[in-house]
Amino acid sequence: MPSAANTATVTAAIATTVAASASNTNNNSVSKEKRSSIISLGGSVIPGTAVAAGAGVATTNGQSNSSAAATADGSQTDLASSNNNGNAAKSKANAVSAAAVVPEPYNPLKQLLVTIEHKIRNLEKRKTKLESYRAIQSSGKELSGDQASAVAKYDAVLANLEFARELAKHIQQQSKEAEKEQKKQARKDNLAKTIAETAKIREVLIIQNVLNCFNDDQVRSDFLNGENGAKKLENTELELLEKFFIETQTRRPETADDVSFIATAQKSAELFYSTINARPKSFGEVSFEKLRSLFQQIQDSGYLDKYYLVPLAENAVANSTDSGTGSGDGESGDLLNDGSGELDAELPSEPSARNSLEEGLDKLHLGVQAELDQHQSYQQQQERPSHLLEPQHQRAPSLEHQQNSMVQQVSTQVYQAAPQAGGTTTPVHVLYAPAPPAQQQPQQPPPHPHQLLSSPVNLQALQTGTAAPPAQQQQPHPTHFAPNVRAVEQNYFKQPPQHPQGPGIQAPQTPQQQQFMQHSRPLAEVLGTGRFHFLQDSELDNPEALAPPPPTNQGLVFEQQPQQPNHVEEPTQAILTLTFTNQSFPSQQPQPQQQGPQQQQQLFSPVLIHEQRQQPPQQQPQPMLIMPRLPTQQPQQPAPQGIGMQAGDVTSGFSYENAVVSYEQQIQQQLKQQQQQQQQQQQNLQQLDEPSSVNSSSSVGAGGDVENNEWHARNNDTNAAATAALTNVLKGETTQATPPAPPTKWSSEMNAMSSAASNGSSNTSHKQEWATPRDHSTGGGNSGYADNNESNNHWNNSQGDGRRNSGNYQRRGGDRDNRDRDQGGRGDERRNGGDRGNYRSRQYGNSSNTNGRNSGNSSGVYFRNNESGNGGGNNYYQNGGGGGGTYNKESRYESSGGGGGSYRGQRGGNQQRNVNGSYGGGRPMGDRGRGGAGNQGGGGGGYINRQNQSQRMPLGLENKN
């Protein structure tokens, strides 16, 4: 009995479990149907189609009988049908709850486990009831028949309960393991499904690409003929492919009658699905299976791959674009062919284009290299000793090299001369170098008897009488100075190796020179149309053709040096600016003395005044050949008046070529004869200089210091002689009545370099400083570099104008408005003994004063005046000379000399210039020594010392005046 009761209990439990399972199944079915109804919301039936999105699902809802009759409008749903049945509220609630519950996958083990658990619970209840019966029975009460039979089954209930628990435990374990396996299998299935789907999509894309490729006529032709590795196809097969291509195209409707895009897409999808799945359904005359096989054969042939690879290498890339985007027009093949032809034509042209570009670059580099080679050749020519003069535009110094030359002393210097303003200027470049072996000088017209070989100025203007100021006046380089002075100048104005430049282009200059450039135009305007013209060797007159020399004064001897082997070449291109290099003139033995007027006219002058134009042509001297002097060729000079220095003695202070014969000695001997003439000329010049007083600031205007009476020591400086000659010429032009008597002899560099201590002249510094034009206007006659005041010109020693002031290098403007002359002999008028700022005072003590006039004030020694008893002496370095306190505190060396400013006085000051009416700006070349006197009194604002010791006269010049 008990066992039967237990069995019944277990059976009832199982039945209950099954009923629960059935109930769950029904619930799940209902929930699925409800979810289907929710999903069907918004589903629309596409007109003309039997199946709409979600319509088929909606019809499964058993609660909606009307859903089967869905109208063509596609707006009906199962939910609406339910509303029609009066169950809208309930259906909606059930649908929402069903949507919220996510159904789990059905697991039978779980269902079985649940059933067993329920049975176990029932067995436990029955066990409890039976235990109660047993307790009643044990208490002595009598049980009913049913109760007694139930208590008899107590042991069976316990056995069933234990069995159920064991079964539930094992089922639970199996269920967990089954779940794990299911998950793994699900992942595998998903992966396989993904691969399968990807393969299908890939196959669809392959089919589309094949169809697009067949739009190319060339491709179709190759497949029809079986060429180029293509599989041979029949026309029927091609027609089949074309049909499939047309039917699988998806198009947007263009009119209301057109099929919708969704319908065409659905049809295309079905065709692709049938093809990729190789369904046996027929398509045209063949099945989809055969159609799929046809596409596979075309792909496996590899023709299409080759077709794309070849165009990339040989043809235009456009071919691949056409075949990849197939428009269905069947024209992409032609485009590809055309593109390939064009590409073939273009590819060969690319190397030629590159070659052309490379050739152009090579030519450019060759041109640059040629210029560099030419530039190097010019530098080599400058460095070699041969004295070949090259065109100025090739020799024009560059700014960088000029700056570099500030640090380096270049032995080879290029002499650049002022260009002639009008016509084709023919600059003469004198390349100065150590004495080379004598060379035959090029054939030249007979030069003037007194040619300044080292003078860069072409005096053809003197012959033509049209000497006009340079059209564009550049800062004058201090032109060729005596060897000793050159070193000093180079320290201040470094002259770099000349580099070729365009014709007519002057190289950039040093800052002092550039400063002068700023004021060059006013100077040019003052000078008028005066011009420098440089003659080539062929244009120069031979000495034989010149007029006979004037009678020489007693004791005045000329020593002629042999022609220098330098060659002068004249470029045909105009030089825009007047340039004087800071080079010393190589000493030269002058030709036998010619007539005084001619000699003075031929003497070198950095600035030619318009007065030369006024001079009649017959008085114009013939051009002088300006050549670099060679120290070796200088003859021994008589009675040295310099400081123990010989003409070629480089150790005299600076290692340079021989000093230039100074014109001073000639003047000294001629002074007495010419004093009356010079006085008369001076008066004439004063009248003429007033209009050109500004010219006192001539581009090379050197303060009286340039004229320091070092001329005994500086006799070798041809620059001094040339300047004096030019000023004499100017004087001669202006005062044609009394031509200055030419010096009979160039006391060659021996005199300048002579070591005679008695003269005390610092011959060592044979440097003709060309004062910057701004210095030109020193107060006294000394002021202007180019002052016409013969006395101001330290060249003017012998000039007949009687300018006593040799102070100015060449004061063309004669004391700016003749103020120097008019103001009590401040400038040029100062007679001997005045503080003539000698560019190179010959005397330390005035001992070399030939006339004894300058003994008092005149000696401004170029180097040291300390020894000179002269009060006014200016020393190049230390103006220890007595006389006024030097204005040049800024000078390189302090000049304690009286009037004399030190060689390098303040450079920038306008004071001296302004006093004299000079430009007024800072000195272009730098006011080298502003005259110790400040240029106020004396004209001595010299190139080196613009000392206003206008009264300082070169010893020789003093006598001249």
Swiss-Prot record:
Family classification: Belongs to the caprin family.
Organism: Drosophila melanogaster
Gly residues bias locations: 869-886, 896-908, 931-943
CC annotations in GO: cytoplasm; cytosol; lipid droplet; ribonucleoprotein complex
Amino-acid biosynthesis found in the keyword field: no
UniProt feature, compositional bias: Low complexity: 80-89, 501-518, 630-641, 678-700, 753-765, 788-797, 845-868
Record protein name field: Caprin homolog
Chief location bin: other
Residue numbers carrying Phosphoserine: 356, 758, 765, 777, 791, 798, 806
One example of a Gene Ontology biological process annotation: cellularization
InterPro entries assigned: Caprin, Caprin-1_dimer
Keyword Coiled coil: yes
Keywords: Coiled coil, Lipid droplet, Phosphoprotein
Record field: compositional bias (Polar residues): 61-79, 400-410
Region (Disordered): 60-89, 320-354, 373-410, 494-518, 541-568, 630-650, 678-711, 753-961
Pfam families per the UniProt record, alphabetical: Caprin-1_dimer
Coiled coil spans: 109-188
Example GO molecular function: RNA binding
Compartment annotation: Lipid droplet
